[in-house]
Every structure is written in C-alpha cells, then in structure tokens.
C-alpha cells in the first residue's frame, strides 16, 4: 500500500522574532501533524505604532502584517500576523492567519503589567525595552517575554501565543464548518 505524499505547504510569518516564529511552527505542527511545512519569517510593517496601545490598534497591526506579507511573498499557502499590544493595564497579542480563502483570528490571554512598567510606557517605549530596564534583563521580547518574567517562567510568550494560534487555526482544522470568508 502506498503512502500518500502531501506537498509541502509554505507558511509566511510576518516577523523575525524567534519567540513568534517558534510559536507559529509549534502550532501548525500540532494542528496538522501529518503535513510538512516550510516556515519563512519576514519583516513587514504593521502600519501601527511600535507599541500599540489599544485592542483595536493591535488587531489592525496583525491584519496589516498579513496584508503586507502577502504583497511581499504572494505564493504562500498561509500567512501569519502576530501583534502584541497594551490596553489599560494589560498586555496581549492578536493572531491573524490567512490562506487564499479563509481567515482565522484569536487574541491571546492577557496579563497585568506592574504600575512601574505602565508609568514608563507613557514615554512611548516598547514593552520589551521597559521590561528589560525594570527587571534587569536583556532582549526579553525575543525570549520568554514579559509573561515569563511575571509568571516566574511558568508561561512564555511562545506558549501563550501557541494557544492563541491553535484557536486562530480553527477555520482551517474544521473546514467543513467554516465556509470561505475571504
């Protein structure tokens, strides 16, 4: 009996951040264990502030990253935009995944930020830079993120993003229940 060979599918990740890339790889491999993927990280503009400060702006940043990734590499099977943001005293991220026919979206869990961090963000710094300054770390945003610091490494940026990405993949893992929406 011959084994069905599946064509490799290309996933373009609109980021060069290792934590984001690892989360995308992990989620796709978990959701589609029989599928072979080629993952490509690219840098594209979000067209929002470096540190989005509302839920709406953060969501728009993830959508824009997907749009710009499609323009940059128009022949991929999937495009993934991830955008972290802040609203009030919490930080979170939006995940947007698109194919030619479908879009899936999800927002990650939110975590409270310390008052000292929030006060320094008023100076328009990125959260990762402020966390490095307050906690004495270096480049935390490309490692475990603020969440690893605040949960004593019980959770990481990648682990939280992984869950949100699995949720954003629902239209793709359940195609019979989700008609084309693009």
From Swiss-Prot:
InterPro entries: ITPase-like_fam, Non_canon_purine_NTPase, NTPase/PRRC1, YjjX_NTPase. Gene3D superfamilies: 3.90.950.10. Phosphatase that hydrolyzes non-canonical purine nucleotides such as XTP and ITP to their respective diphosphate derivatives. Probably excludes non-canonical purines from DNA/RNA precursor pool, thus preventing their incorporation into DNA/RNA and avoiding chromosomal lesions. GO terms for biological process: nucleotide metabolic process; thiamine metabolic process. One of its GO terms (molecular function) is nucleotide binding. Belongs to the YjjX NTPase family. Pfam families: NTPase_I-T (PF01931). It comes from the Bacteria. It catalyses: XTP + H2O = XDP + phosphate + H(+); ITP + H2O = IDP + phosphate + H(+). Homodimer. This is Inosine/xanthosine triphosphatase. Its EC number is 3.6.1.73. Binds 1 divalent metal cation per subunit; can use either Mg(2+) or Mn(2+). It comes from Vibrio parahaemolyticus serotype O3:K6 (strain RIMD 2210633). Its cofactor is Mg(2+); Mn(2+). Keywords: Hydrolase, Magnesium, Manganese, Metal-binding, Nucleotide metabolism, Nucleotide-binding. It is an enzyme of class 3 (hydrolase). SUPFAM superfamilies: ITPase-like (SSF52972). Coiled coil: none annotated.
């Amino acid at each position: 009996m011959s084994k069905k060979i599946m064509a490799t599918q290309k996933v373009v990740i609109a980021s060069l951040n290792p934590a984001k890339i690892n989360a995308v790889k992990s989620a796709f491999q978990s959701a589609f264990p029989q599928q072979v993927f080629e993952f490509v990280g690219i840098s594209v503009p979000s067209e929002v502030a470096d540190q989005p400060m509302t839920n709406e702006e953060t969501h728009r940043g993830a959508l824009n990253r997907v749009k710009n990734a499609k323009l940059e590499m128009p022949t991929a099977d999937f495009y993934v935009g991830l955008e972290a943001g802040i609203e009030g005293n919490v930080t979170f991220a939006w995940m947007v995944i698109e194919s030619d026919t479908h879009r899936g979206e999800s927002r990650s869990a939110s975590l409270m930020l310390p008052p000292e961090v929030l006060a320094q963000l008023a100076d328009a710094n990125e959260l990762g830079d402020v966390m490095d300054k307050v906690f004495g770390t270096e480049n935390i945003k490309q490692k475990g993120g603020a969440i690893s610091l605040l949960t004593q490494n019980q959770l990481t940026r990648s682990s939280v993003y992984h869950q949100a990405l699995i949720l954003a993949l629902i239209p793709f893992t359940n195609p019979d229940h989700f008609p084309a929406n693009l």
